[in-house]
Amino acid sequence: GFGSLLGKALKAGLKLGANLLGGAPQQ
């Protein structure tokens, strides 16, 4: 449902934020 989608987006955002803060972007 919508909650599951939101959770996925949140997790992805946290991962991106951690990578950016760690100075190791995976792009």
UniProtKB/Swiss-Prot annotation:
Organs and tissues of expression: Expressed by the skin glands.
Gene Ontology cellular-component terms listed: extracellular region
GO biological process terms on file: defense response
Domain of life: Eukaryota
Keywords assigned: Amphibian defense peptide, Antimicrobial, Secreted
Record localization: Secreted
Keyword check for Secreted: yes
Family: Belongs to the gastrin/cholecystokinin family.
Summary of the function given for this chain in its UniProt record: Antimicrobial peptide.
Protein name: Caerulein precursor fragment R2
Organism: Xenopus ruwenzoriensis (Uganda clawed frog)
